[in-house]
Amino acid sequence: MHSKRYSLTEGSIWKAMLFFAFPVFLGNVFQQLYNTFDAWCVGNYIGDDALAAVSSSGSLIFMMVSFFNGVAMGAGVVIARSFGAKQYDTMNKAIHTAIAFGLVTGVMLTVAGVALTPTILRWMGTPAEVLPQSIAYFRYYFCGAIFTVMYNIFVGILHAVGDSKHPLYYLIFSAFVNIVLDMLFVAVLGFGVGSAAIATTISQGVSALLCLLHLVRVDAPYRVSIRKIRLDKTSLVEIIRYGLPSGVQNSVIALANVVVQANINSFGKAAMAGCGSYSKLEGFAFLPVTCFTQALSTFVGQNLGAHRHDRVKKGVGFGIACSCIMAELIGVLSYLFAPQLISLFSDSQESIAFGTQHMRTICLFYCLLAFSHCIAGIMRGAGKATVPMFTMLACWCLFRVTYISVAVKLVNQLTTVSWAYPITWTLSSIIFLIYFLKADWIHNFDRDFKQA
């Protein structure tokens, strides 16, 4: 059995955390590499219009996918809790319910994404000269949305039981597939911007299939049986209970970021290309944030399920410190080398200037972003998903949109838009710190667990 090997409830805390987080970090590196390679490839082989079309994709894709990924987080909480408590029957039902739910919602997302892409892009104020290529890219991308949803479901299952290595192997292989197909479709065959999305769709399908094959074949309590894939009412209620707040949070925040992107679009395609190039680089800055957030959520869920309160208290401090220090180090390096980094995607001096300005306004505040995400991950692992939901909705959505709506009218500059991120990260960090220090979230988990 592999269950003991992947348990985070025993042994050295820092080793358990790092051994889980490091493969997640490497996996995210490769995922970000092939996302970035799309932008690099179309920017260098097609041109700035294509780069603008692809680079503005982040906020729209995140808006469409984030709700379903948030609900998948709920499945991870239920699975990690049951795994830590060694309640394998409950865990097994949750796993198969999560897969069934992912299949249903993945189809819904694919249909909605293909149908709504033109409307959303026009609402975002996408310039007319970029719009056709943007529509082509997004429609091809959303044709494979079901693969994205299922991959996240499978990875969520593996992470919940402490296995972060196998997703890494599959992501490395799919990243290689994506890069090869990008070069073939765009650079060699000259198929256009849509082919970059097709390459991404194929690679996501490959990674989802590899994860499924592993789950079907693994000799462990979390083994998947195709015949058992169905919606179990009790498991679904638990998954939605923990996942719906994260899904709503992700979607509404993504909508707020679409508003930010729409304001960036108003400065023209050079601003779109420059800021879009930054958004690809920003993904690398988020790597320590995302890997430690996932590690903390799984660590807290497993150890609270096993009633290891002492490990929880020690582990969260270590995880937060590592994430914040690494994020800020990346932020400082990003500030120092901003022009050189942006120029990797475009040789347009105007685009480089916009991207550099945007990056340098934001990047020194990455430690606050890391802190907010870590506390959110801890609260999700503790079954308190409504805490990050309300905090982030208030700070990253309502306040961010209000700030943008007012500030841009007063000072119509790109830096005004850029400041929306540091200001709202600061606000959420203050609220999270107060809750983290004052609330009895550890023992509340025990009471909720007994009721479940």
Kindly label every feature range from the protein language model.
Residues 1-21, 79-146, 188-244, 300-365, ...:
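Short alpha-helical transmembrane segments in multi-pass integral membrane proteins
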Residues 10, 14-33, 37, 60-67, ...:
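Residue-level signal for short hydrophobic patches within transmembrane helices
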Residues 19-38, 140, 151, 174, ...:
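Transmembrane helical elements of multi-pass membrane transporters/channels
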Residues 33-51, 121-128, 184-191, 251-280, ...:
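Helix-terminus/linker motif at the lipid-water interface of multi-pass membrane proteins
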Residues 36-40, 111, 153-157, 179-184, ...:
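Alpha-helical transmembrane segments of multipass membrane proteins
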Residues 48-59, 138, 197, 269-284, ...:
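Small-residue hotspots at the loop-to-helix junctions and early N-terminal turns
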Residues 51-111, 148-167, 261, 274-338, ...:
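Small-residue-rich hydrophobic transmembrane alpha-helices
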Residues 72, 141-159, 167-175, 196-211, ...:
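Short runs within selected transmembrane alpha-helices of multi-pass transporters and secretion channels
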